[in-house]
Curated annotation (Swiss-Prot):
The protein's name: PKHD-type hydroxylase YbiX
Gene3D superfamilies: q2cbj1_9rhob like domain, Rabenosyn, Rab binding domain
Residues at which 2-oxoglutarate binds: 168
Lineage: Bacteria, Pseudomonadati, Pseudomonadota, Gammaproteobacteria, Enterobacterales
EC numbers, comma separated: 1.14.11.-
Gene (UniProt): ybiX
Cofactor note: Binds 1 Fe(2+) ion per subunit.
Species of the source: Shigella dysenteriae serotype 1 (strain Sd197)
Cofactor annotation: Fe(2+); L-ascorbate
Keyword field: Dioxygenase, Iron, Metal-binding, Oxidoreductase, Vitamin C
Fe2OG dioxygenase domain residues: 78-177
GO biological process, one term: intracellular iron ion homeostasis
Length: 225
């Protein structure tokens, strides 16, 4: 399942990020890619050794950790260190698959259940640059407003189409979920959304409490902590 998570960053935050990224040190994006990805990757990434990078990635982590919809959809156990990429002048990233595991500075290793892209450029400011994700339901093309995030299974083949005008800047990361199975995670998300909708419409009730109990018992049964 793919999920659109709106408003992870406010317009003011986006403007500040873009200003700071305009002063960043950019390097060849292939430095963080395996052998397969390096053959089809042509973009730039912020140098992870820079002081600016350390500050920006912490801000992204804080933003996603505080976003209730992101938590409900991803049920994150571990978040990778966010990275930042830039596409311009026909740069692109061909179809590839993300690695199943990644090194993590605190946990040693993490499993990549979900991939996330946080858009930092206004969609009208560049041509091309769509995130294209293939899954069992077909092909999905994603180009979201600045400050919005898309979540999708890391098991999906995906690419970024060439940017033929302007500049596309984004942050991206991977998530190890408490719920490994995509279908179970999707069911919990739907249950959670409906519980919240019923609470806002009718207030607290015994039936809602029973559904909440069901949600937490399923989370307890399925989660890997």
């Amino acid at each position: 399942m793919m999920y659109h998570i709106p408003g992870v960053l406010s317009p003011q935050d986006v403007a500040r990020f873009r200003e700071q990224l305009g002063q960043a040190e950019w390097v060849d994006g292939r430095v963080t890619t395996g052998a397969q990805g390096a053959q089809v990757k042509n973009n730039q990434q912020v140098d992870t050794r820079s002081t600016l990078y350390a500050a920006l990635q912490n801000e992204v982590l804080n933003a996603v950790n505080q976003h209730a919809l992101f938590f409900a959809a991803a049920l994150p156990r571990t978040l990778s260190t966010p990275l930042f990429n830039r596409y311009q002048n026909n740069e692109t990233y061909g179809f590839h698959v993300d690695g199943a595991v990644r090194s993590h500075p605190q946990n040693g290793w993490m499993r990549t259940d979900l991939s996330a892209t946080l858009f930092l450029s206004d969609p009208e400011s560049y041509d091309g640059g769509e995130l294209v994700v293939n899954d069992t339901f077909g092909q999905h093309r994603v180009k979201l407003p600045a400050g919005d995030l898309v979540l999708y299974p890391s098991s999906s083949l995906h690419c970024v189409t060439p940017v033929t005008r302007g500049v596309r800047v984004a942050s991206f990361m991977w998530i190890q979920s408490m719920i490994r199975d995509d279908k179970k995670r999707a069911m919990l998300f739907e249950l959670d959304k409906n519980i919240q909708s019923l609470k806002s419409r009718y207030g607290e009730s015994e039936e809602i409490l029973s559904l909440l109990n069901l949600y937490h018992n399923l989370l307890r049964e399925w989660s890997e902590i």
